Amino acid sequence: MIGTSFPEDLDCGNFFDNMDDLMDFPGGDIDVGFGIGDSDSFPTIWTTHHDTWPAASDPLFSSNTNSDSSPELYVPFEDIVKVERPPSFVEETLVEKKEDSFSTNTDSSSSHSQFRSSSPVSVLESSSSSSQTTNTTSLVLPGKHGRPRTKRPRPPVQDKDRVKDNVCGGDSRLIIRIPKQFLSDHNKMINKKKKKKAKITSSSSSSGIDLEVNGNNVDSYSSEQYPLRKCMHCEVTKTPQWRLGPMGPKTLCNACGVRYKSGRLFPEYRPAASPTFTPALHSNSHKKVAEMRNKRCSDGSYITEENDLQGLIPNNAYIGVD
């Protein structure tokens, strides 16, 4: 019991000197001839009561009264505070790390907690220091600032129902926006066409010659480039194809050109669409033309080649050659 409660650094020499003083009894009190049974009459040196031992409040002994607990060495309070409290620069670095990162670092907290002990003073200091660090971090942490709003007004948002009413309402016209460049090009083309028409009208007014074809006025400019063509036998102006005649190529209409090629073109022949056609003198049938020629022969009027040519080419015919 004694060995377990004393520390190892206790001065044993002084302890045994005190024992010698206690053992120094006067000689008159001791009987020379005492037996074994008289041993109970001697006063006991060691007391079994714990009250004679130093109290728990003695600074040489620890505050733990359990017999099973290990012996503890007394250390002054100032030394404990120095060991428990880390240097100031360590705390500053920890606070800076917390300010830089929004989440607390577990490694720094573990390294900071290894300096702590189980004393109540250290627990109070640790709680106060942790509260100070949390207050500082809560003040220093920057907030998430959003982007500043611009002063430009936003366009008004139209409702979908209003848009549908405007598009699908009573007035179903759709407004199409045309780019300005396209409009400018279109206006330029219109101006060019107007200038060309003005030039043509000025040239026609300067010449002063107008022709009427089917009730339409034709400028002299167009009549000079494209003259009106007529068939030299029947004076037809419209035909699907112009053919070769006695006056050159493209001088006869299609019907007269076919008969001229086969040698059956006579003065009595006229197409039904010819403006010079008279039923008493002309016909578009080859049989009737042959009968008419036979009557003339029987009457004594002989038909010569000159008469054929005069019948072939009218005097008032307009000759147009490309």
UniProtKB/Swiss-Prot annotation:
<dbReference type="GO" id="GO:0003700">
    <property type="term" value="F:DNA-binding transcription factor activity"/>
</dbReference>
<keyword id="KW-0862">Zinc</keyword>
<dbReference type="GO" id="GO:0007623">
    <property type="term" value="P:circadian rhythm"/>
</dbReference>
<dbReference type="GO" id="GO:0000976">
    <property type="term" value="F:transcription cis-regulatory region binding"/>
</dbReference>
<keyword id="KW-0539">Nucleus</keyword>
<dbReference type="GO" id="GO:0045893">
    <property type="term" value="P:positive regulation of DNA-templated transcription"/>
</dbReference>
<keyword id="KW-0805">Transcription regulation</keyword>
<dbReference type="InterPro" id="IPR000679">
    <property type="entry name" value="Znf_GATA"/>
</dbReference>
<dbReference type="InterPro" id="IPR013088">
    <property type="entry name" value="Znf_NHR/GATA"/>
</dbReference>
<dbReference type="GO" id="GO:0005634">
    <property type="term" value="C:nucleus"/>
</dbReference>
<dbReference type="GO" id="GO:0009845">
    <property type="term" value="P:seed germination"/>
</dbReference>
<feature type="short sequence motif" description="Nuclear localization signal">
    <location>
        <begin position="147"/>
        <end position="154"/>
    </location>
</feature>
<comment type="similarity">
    <text>Belongs to the type IV zinc-finger family. Class A subfamily.</text>
</comment>
<keyword id="KW-0863">Zinc-finger</keyword>
<dbReference type="InterPro" id="IPR051140">
    <property type="entry name" value="GATA_TF"/>
</dbReference>
<keyword id="KW-0804">Transcription</keyword>
<keyword id="KW-0238">DNA-binding</keyword>
<dbReference type="Pfam" id="PF00320">
    <property type="entry name" value="GATA"/>
</dbReference>
<feature type="compositionally biased region" description="Basic residues">
    <location>
        <begin position="144"/>
        <end position="154"/>
    </location>
</feature>
<dbReference type="InterPro" id="IPR016679">
    <property type="entry name" value="TF_GATA_pln"/>
</dbReference>
<keyword id="KW-0010">Activator</keyword>
<feature type="zinc finger region" description="GATA-type">
    <location>
        <begin position="225"/>
        <end position="279"/>
    </location>
</feature>
<protein>
    <recommendedName>
        <fullName>GATA transcription factor 8</fullName>
    </recommendedName>
</protein>
<keyword id="KW-0479">Metal-binding</keyword>
<comment type="function">
    <text>Transcriptional activator that specifically binds 5'-GATA-3' or 5'-GAT-3' motifs within gene promoters. May be involved in the regulation of some light-responsive genes.</text>
</comment>
<feature type="compositionally biased region" description="Low complexity">
    <location>
        <begin position="102"/>
        <end position="141"/>
    </location>
</feature>
<feature type="region of interest" description="Disordered">
    <location>
        <begin position="93"/>
        <end position="168"/>
    </location>
</feature>
<dbReference type="GO" id="GO:0008270">
    <property type="term" value="F:zinc ion binding"/>
</dbReference>
